[in-house]
Structure formats: structure tokens, C-alpha cells
A protein has these predicted regions:
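Short glycine/threonine-rich loop-to-helix capping motif typified by GTGT followed
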Residues: 96-99, 254-269, 334-342
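Short beta-strand segments
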Residues: 21, 85-86, 135-141, 322-327
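Active-site-proximal alpha-helical scaffold in enzymes
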Residues: 110-137, 176, 297-318
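Short, well-ordered amphipathic alpha-helical segments that serve as non-catalytic structural scaffolds
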Residues: 58-74, 122, 223-238, 305-310
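Long, repeat-rich segments with strong aromatic
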Residues: 227, 233-265
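Short acidic, glycine/serine/threonine-rich loops at helix termini
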Residues: 31-33, 94-96, 146-151, 214, ...
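Conserved beta-ketoacyl condensing-enzyme motif
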Residues: 20, 54-114, 245-260
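Condensing-enzyme catalytic core mediating Claisen C-C bond formation in acyl metabolism
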Residues: 1-55, 153-233, 238-241, 274-291, ...
Length: 360
């Protein structure tokens, strides 16, 4: 039997809700000192995470988030059918080295800072299609490894313009499944469930590559805002919704500069999301006291805010339906140095509150 789940031009509406079984967030001290510090599972004081290199540190923090998400659901690595993970480093090395010991079938992803949306989208399709009982989605970033990869060595001490964002040192991981998570207890289970309330993924809108010709690697918000606009507008059109049909629309890391551009672009399309919009990069830091300029960025920005703040907020009845839109600037060292622009992409995930029947 052919199940048609496409919705509009580029979205999918799942016939069966995809349950977020558990989630975990791991960050460093700077993120722990920010406004959301109390929401994260683990705050590590050592930016090296007990390793000798920045890259190994990022691998370690992603592994910690993945293992914690698995542990919260009372599972083992052998219970997970697939792992979708990615990061900002070349050949997704933080993910491949970080998760190698887990021995879980692995798909390495690259969507820049949109990777958490990419992993949740692919994981949800696999769950709804019956290709796994439990699927792990994870992403990470590290301030120092990203600076080393894309910008300047830390010892160089370059000046950062106000449009620049601060790469989050953090990771987020989620376990997806086709059944409601078990009730949490005080001993072994800390699942994403509050009595009968769970969080489910009900739909996705896959991002398109949008290139407005920006070439400023220190203004990622401007590169990503057109992609966020395109995806949000298509999501609203495909699902026949208004911005007010979402309690909140969370973008990944547009920052203050990108948010302004996003509002202007969506206004041109006839949408005003200003009353429901929040940006993970603007939430995770206090720009005034932490000197983060336009806000936070990185794969770990949207992922850690989702796992630490947004998903728990859904089961605590803070929001009934949200749109999670992590945003990515597809910055390549090679193409950038050859003079090419930096295209953007954004993937949207619809996450809703779900009430489990009393007998379950």
C-alpha cells in the first residue's frame, strides 16, 4: 500500500507521530554561564574535555551527549538501529571519531549549523517508514575547533565585527522512536515524558540551497536569513498555517543581524513572525555581559537549546506546537578562498505536544 505523506511542494506530514524518547545536552562553562545555563544536563569546566586537542574535545562532548540520551531511556547502544550525526569539521571528523566506539550504524551528515534539523528529519522519516525502533540524532560544535577550521588560530587575537557570532561549545542528542517513551522514574529512566505528555515530530519541511551572494564569513546571519525565510514561508504554505498557529518559531543561529533580515524578507512574502520568533543563538548567551556580539552559532547551538530548553518546555506545557528551524551557512574553506559566495540552508521540524492515552 502506497502511503502518500507529502504535503504541499516540499513538506512531509507524518501519518504516525514520531516520539522523542529522550534528549541530552552537554555544554562548556561559557554556555553554562548564559541565560539557559540551568537547563543543560552537563556543564564541563574544562574546554578540552580531558583531551589533548580541540577536535578530540568536540568528539568527546558529542559522545557524552549521545550516551546520556541513550542512558536516559534505559537503552544500550545495541538497541539503536541508526545514528544520524554531523558537525562543522572536515569530513565530519568530530562525529565519526566521537561515535566510533558506540558501534551504531552511522550516517555522517553535513548541513553546517542546520545539521540537527537534517538529522531529525531523516531520523523521523526512518521511524515513520518502519526502518528502526530507535534512532539517535546528534550534532556538536566547539568554539576553538571551529575557529581553527574556518577563521583564525586563537592565539592570533583577531578583532571580531559586531555581526560576528560566537560558536557554541556544545552538543545535543535525541532518541526517536515509534512508541511513547516509558514513564520516567527516580532510578534508571529520565525520558522525555511528563505524566501523559510527550513531544512528537509531526512534520518536516526540507531546506533548499539559497544563495544571495554573501561573501562575509564573519556575518553568518546575513548568509542564513534568506534560507530561513524560504523554509519558513514554504512550511506555512504547505501546511496551510499562519505564524500564530505556532506557539514559537525557533531559528538556529541567525543572531541579531540575521533576525532583522529574516523579518524584512518574510514581511515581503506577507508573513509577520515577530511575535512568535525566537533564535537559539540569541537565547543561549547574554550578548551584553558575555561579549558574543550578534549571538551564538554552530551545530551545537540549536542542538543544545533544543535538547536542554525547547523539548522539556513542550512536555511542561510551555508550548503546544513549535517550529524548529536550525539554519546553516555552507561555508567551505576552498570555495570561500576561491571567491565563491556562502549559500545558506534551513530545515524545519514541526514538534508538538502529545497526550498519551491513560492505559499506556
Amino acid at each position: 500500500m502506497n502511503r502518500q505523506m507529502t504535503c504541499g511542494t516540499s513538506s512531509i506530514s507524518f501519518q504516525n507521530p514520531v516520539f522523542v524518547q529522550s534528549c541530552a545536552s552537554v555544554v562548556s562553562r561559557k554556555e553554562g554561564e548564559g541565560p539557559l545555563g540551568a537547563y543543560f544536563d552537563t556543564i564541563c569546566e574544562d574546554p578540552m574535555f580531558g583531551t589533548d586537542t580541540w577536535e578530540a574535545a568536540e568528539s568527546t562532548l558529542q559522545k557524552q551527549a549521545a550516551l546520556l540520551a541513550i542512558k536516559k531511556n534505559g537503552l544500550t547502544c545495541s538497541d539503536i538501529q541508526l545514528l544520524f550525526a554531523g558537525d562543522l569539521l572536515a569530513q565530519t571528523s568530530a562525529s565519526s571519531f566521537g561515535t566510533a566506539d558506540l558501534k551504531i550504524p552511522f550516517y555522517g551528515l553535513f548541513g553546517a549549523c542546520s545539521t540537527m534539523g537534517e538529522s531529525l528529519s531523516l531520523g523521523s522519516m526512518c521511524i515513520d517508514g518502519g526502518y528502526g525502533k530507535y534512532i539517535l540524532c546528534a550534532t556538536s560544535s566547539h568554539f576553538a575547533s571551529a575557529e581553527k577550521e574556518f577563521r583564525f588560530p586563537l592565539g592570533y587575537g583577531n578583532q571580531r565585527p559586531l555581526s560576528a557570532t560566537w560558536t557554541v561549545t556544545g552538543a545535543g542528542a535525541c532518541i526517536l522512536g515509534y512508541e511513547p517513551p516509558p514513564r520516567p522514574n527516580n532510578k534508571t529512566l529520565n525520558t522525555l515524558r511528563n505524566r501523559n505528555i510527550c513531544a512528537v515530530i509531526t512534520g518536516i519541511t526540507t531546506g533548499r540551497l539559497i544563495d544571495f551572494g554573501f561573501r562575509d564569513s564573519l556575518n553568518m546571519g546575513a548568509c542564513m536569513a534568506p534560507a530561513a525565510c524560504d523554509t519558513i514561508a514554504r512550511n506555512l504554505q504547505d501546511f496551510h498555517r499562519k505564524p500564530s498557529d505556532y506557539d514559537a518559531i525557533f531559528t538556529g543561529d541567525l543572531g541579531m543581524v540575521g533576525q532583522t533580515i529574516l523579518f524584512d524578507l518574510l514581511t515581503e512574502k506577507g508573513f509577520d513572525i515577530s511575535s512568535v520568533h525566537q533564535d537559539c543563538g540569541m537565547l543561549i548567551y547574554d550578548s551584553q555581559t558575555q561579549d558574543t556580539h550578534s549571538g551564538g552559532s554552530g551545530c551545537g547551538c540549536a542542538a543544545s537549546v533544543l535538547a536542554g530548553y525547547i523539548l522539556p518546555g513542550i512536555i511542561q506545557k510551555k508550548w503546544k506546537r513549535i517550529l524548529f528551524v536550525p539554519t546553516g551557512a555552507l561555508l567551505s574553506k576552498v570555495s570561500f578562498n576561491e571567491g565563491d559566495p556562502i549559500p545558506g540552508i534551513a530545515h524545519a521540524v514541526v514538534i508538538e505536544q502529545y497526550r498519551v492515552p491513560d492505559m499506556m
